[in-house]
């Protein structure tokens, strides 16, 4: 169970880092938002899911 928690935390950190860089780039590009809207929403949904997964796994470990 600890390995799953560590992998979920790593995935959350990696997703956060990717979104931290990619979202401003999408908003700064001239036609970025209209062409990359689905990618931003998918990344945000993945991030929210990982936050809940880390919370659930943390409650099971502690």
UniProtKB/Swiss-Prot annotation:
It is found in: Plastid, Chloroplast thylakoid membrane. InterPro entries: PSII_PsbZ (IPR002644), PSII_PsbZ_sf (IPR036512). Its main location: plastid. Disulfide bonds: none annotated. Pfam families: Ycf9. The chain crosses the membrane at residues 8-28, 41-61. It comes from the Eukaryota. Signal peptide: none annotated. One of its GO terms (cellular component) is chloroplast thylakoid membrane. It is a multi-pass membrane protein. May control the interaction of photosystem II (PSII) cores with the light-harvesting antenna, regulates electron flow through the 2 photosystem reaction centers. PSII is a light-driven water plastoquinone oxidoreductase, using light energy to abstract electrons from H(2)O, generating a proton gradient subsequently used for ATP formation. PANTHER family: PHOTOSYSTEM II REACTION CENTER PROTEIN Z (PTHR34971:SF2). Belongs to the PsbZ family. PSII is composed of 1 copy each of membrane proteins PsbA, PsbB, PsbC, PsbD, PsbE, PsbF, PsbH, PsbI, PsbJ, PsbK, PsbL, PsbM, PsbT, PsbY, PsbZ, Psb30/Ycf12, at least 3 peripheral proteins of the oxygen-evolving complex and a large number of cofactors. It forms dimeric complexes. This is Photosystem II reaction center protein Z. The lineage of its organism: Eukaryota, Viridiplantae, Streptophyta, Embryophyta, Tracheophyta.
């Amino acid at each position: 169970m600890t390995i799953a928690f560590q992998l979920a935390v790593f995935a959350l950190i990696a997703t956060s880092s990717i979104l931290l860089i990619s979202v401003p780039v999408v908003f700064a590009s001239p036609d970025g938002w209209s062409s990359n809207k689905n990618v931003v929403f998918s990344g945000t949904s993945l991030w929210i899911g990982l936050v809940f997964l880390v919370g659930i796994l943390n409650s099971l470990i502690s």
